[in-house]
Amino acid sequence: MPTINQLVRQGRTVEVVKSKSPAMENCPQRRGVCTRVYTTTPKKPNSALRKVAKVRLTNGFEVISYIGGEGHNLQEHSVVLVRGGRVKDLPGVRYHIVRGSLDLQGVKDRKQARSKYGAKKPKAK
């Protein structure tokens, strides 16, 4: 425990909180252009081919972001909207691409959790 004299001389240092998604620069979403669309494999106990894209954001950052849902229509030079949010079993993937926005279509035939995948409400029969 410091003395009063030490506190007068030095003062307390405030802990700096490090951002979990620094490329967003405190914005909720960012627009970007896909530079590479590919699949990658997850960490140890899991096994799959996860769809990811390398995206060059409008602020100059180049990030790897995850494409959620079944199937997608992304190619190189597609314009996408990127949000924060990591993928636990993919190291280095700290962002998600927003479905149903800009060039990325929503998930087809999606019935539940539609808002997360940009799917329209199906026609009632």
Swiss-Prot record:
With S4 and S5 plays an important role in translational accuracy. Interacts with and stabilizes bases of the 16S rRNA that are involved in tRNA selection in the A site and with the mRNA backbone. Located at the interface of the 30S and 50S subunits, it traverses the body of the 30S subunit contacting proteins on the other side and probably holding the rRNA structure together. The combined cluster of proteins S8, S12 and S17 appears to hold together the shoulder and platform of the 30S subunit. It comes from Acidovorax ebreus (strain TPSY). This is Small ribosomal subunit protein uS12. The keyword Ribosomal protein applies. InterPro entries: NA-bd_OB-fold (IPR012340), Ribosomal_uS12 (IPR006032), Ribosomal_uS12_bac (IPR005679). GO terms for cellular component: small ribosomal subunit. PROSITE patterns: RIBOSOMAL_S12. GO terms for biological process: translation. Belongs to the universal ribosomal protein uS12 family. GO terms for molecular function: rRNA binding; structural constituent of ribosome; tRNA binding. Keywords: Methylation, Ribonucleoprotein, Ribosomal protein, RNA-binding, rRNA-binding, tRNA-binding. The keyword tRNA-binding applies. Part of the 30S ribosomal subunit. Contacts proteins S8 and S17. May interact with IF1 in the 30S initiation complex. The modification 3-methylthioaspartic acid is found at D89. PANTHER family: 30S RIBOSOMAL PROTEIN S12 FAMILY MEMBER (PTHR11652).
